[in-house]
Design a protein with these regions (language model features):
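Membrane-embedded alpha-helical hairpins and interfacial helices in multi-pass inner-membrane proteins
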Residues: 36-45, 54, 74-100, 104-178
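Membrane-interfacial loop-to-transmembrane alpha-helix junctions, especially the N-terminal start
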Residues: 64-66, 114
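Membrane-interface alpha-helices at helix entry/exit sites of multi-pass transporters
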Residues: 13, 68, 143-144
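Short, Lys/Arg-enriched N-terminal segments with co-localized hydrophobic residues
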Residues: 1-10
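Hydrophobic transmembrane alpha-helices
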Residues: 10-60, 64
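Small-polar-interrupted transmembrane alpha-helices in polytopic inner-membrane proteins
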Residues: 28, 69-77
Length: 178
């Protein structure tokens, strides 16, 4: 009887992780499309303020955010007609590395604030997407990397921080992901 309970509990945990990842991916795609609908190309230019990137904060609370955000980015970039040819691969790789890094560094804080983790998406996206932009549209790697980093850091340090503190203040980290 005990082994059945454990196996069922393990299955519930796997199912919960899969469901969380799927919901996060769907939210990412929906938010990005909605933003692009309201303000065309605001989520796809070199200096982009992709509101959905604030969801990267979820990687501080659950490992399900790693595949969820990676797949969400992949789905949007594949489905967006204006995406660069390799953006589905490069952008998704940047999301994977950033969210995995965020999850691994989530306990490194400054007075309870996970600054390092919140900056990782800016770093990975700047390096990878900055390179991709330089390859396809030119303008220089460092300038493109700077543009990407500015947009990414702005979203994570504002909207991402607000989301982080809202989740913590309402103890939703335990309720939603516990």
């Amino acid at each position: 009887m005990h082994s059945r309970f454990f196996a069922g509990d393990l299955m519930n945990k796997k199912t919960r992780m899969l469901a969380h990842g799927a919901v996060i991916a769907a939210l990412y795609v929906a938010l990005t499309y909605f933003q692009n609908f309201l303000i065309p190309n605001s989520a796809t230019w070199a200096i982009q303020f992709r509101v959905s990137e604030a969801l990267c904060v979820l990687a501080l609370f659950t490992p399900a955010a790693i595949p969820g955000l990676t797949i969400g980015c992949l789905l949007f970039n594949i489905s967006f007609a204006g995406a660069l040819p390799l953006d589905f691969l490069i952008g998704s790789l940047a999301s994977l590395l950033a969210t995995a890094g965020m999850y691994l560094t989530r306990r490194i804080t400054i007075k309870g604030y996970p600054l390092l983790a919140l900056l990782l998406p800016a770093v990975f996206n700047a390096l990878l997407v900055g390179w991709e932009l330089d390859v396809y549209i030119g303008g220089g790697f460092w300038l493109n990397a700077l543009y990407v980093a500015i947009g990414e850091a702005a979203v994570l340090l504002t909207l991402g921080s607000l989301l982080y503190y809202a989740i913590k203040a309402r103890h939703l980290d335990n309720t939603l992901f516990g």
